[in-house]
Design a protein with these regions (language model features):
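Short, solvent-exposed loop/turn segments at secondary-structure boundaries
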Residues: 60-63, 123-124, 243
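Conserved beta-strand hairpin/beta-sheet module of binuclear metal-dependent hydrolase folds
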Residues: 11-74, 168-182, 186
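Metallo-beta-lactamase
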Residues: 67-70, 74-97, 109-158, 163, ...
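Cap/insert and terminal regions of metallo-dependent hydrolase folds
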Residues: 69, 74, 175-246
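Short, conserved loop/helix-junction motifs that constitute active-site signature segments
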Residues: 102-106
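Beta-strand-turn-beta hairpins that frame and shape the catalytic cleft
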Residues: 1-6, 41-46, 148-156, 173-177
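Active-site metal-binding loops of divalent metal-dependent hydrolases
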Residues: 51-53, 94, 116, 162-163, ...
Length: 246
């Protein structure tokens, strides 16, 4: 069975409130979350999970500071690749900060949950600012329904709540199953301290703060925490220090 490595490509950062990653918690605390595309190394095809988004585009749609670390093209060049070399883009979900470079991958099959694509093309008014239709036009979508193996050792898991069709990505590695979460979170989302557990004994994880269904979001966070040997929160604040996983 194939064993892969995951290469985080940190493209930039976006300022947000910490409560966006942990519902009800630390409201007013500002953090800079990394904007990341993940390359799956070792596959016969060139596979990315999400493609990030340029800072100027993010600031156009979201009222918060953003900055670029490197361009999408520069990040791929370090791997000896160009956007046209990408065969598969797996989208955790279709918020603009995760799919802002996908249109550059002109030869890629874009894997997304059916429920996510349907919602993205006709979002509820509350979430219209997170789905940018012109980012989605002309993409070669490959909709899937539920848990699906994409290639040997790479599987998507339907983990709704953050969005209706959020999907986490389970990847076989030499050190077990690594899961890139399909929802926006940080490592603290999964680390509820004892003092909080005394008040909320059933909170084994925090609920991701941006969600279309908070109950599903909690359940999905709990699900991936239980399944993963290596947990990769989508906006882990330490990703900029990581060259490869594991």
């Amino acid at each position: 069975m194939a064993k892969y490595e995951i290469i985080p490509l940190v493209l930039g950062s976006l300022e947000t409130d910490k409560s966006m990653m942990m519902m009800f918690m630390e409201c007013g605390t500002k953090i800079n979350i990394p904007i990341v595309s993940f390359y799956i190394k070792g596959a016969k095809k060139n596979i990315l999970v999400d493609t990030g988004c340029p800072a100027d585009v993010m600031m156009k749609y979201w009222p918060a500071p953003a900055s670029d670390t490197q361009s999408f093209e520069e990040a791929l060049e370090k791997l000896g690749l160009k956007p046209g070399d990408i065969d598969i883009v797996i989208h955790t979900h279709l918020h603009f900060d995760h799919c802002g470079n996908t249109s550059k991958c002109t030869n890629a099959k874009v894997v997304v949950q059916e429920d996510e694509l349907k919602f993205a093309l006709s979002p509820h008014p509350v979430y219209t600012m997170l789905y940018i239709r012109n980012m989605l036009e002309r993409l070669n979508f490959y909709p899937v329904k539920g848990d699906t193996e994409i290639v040997e050792g790479v599987k998507v898991l339907h983990t709704p709540g953050h969005t209706p069709g959020a999907q986490s990505v389970a990847i076989d590695t030499a050190k077990g199953t690594a899961i890139i979460t399909g929802f926006c979170c940080i490592r603290e989302t999964f680390e509820v301290p004892d003092e909080a557990r005394q008040l909320f004994p059933y909170w084994l994880v925090y609920t991701p703060g941006i969600n279309t269904n908070s109950l599903e979001a909690f359940d999905s966070a709990l699900k991936v925490k239980g399944l993963a040997d290596i947990l990769i929160p989508l906006h882990d604040l330490e990703l900029g220090k990581v060259k490869k996983i594991p």
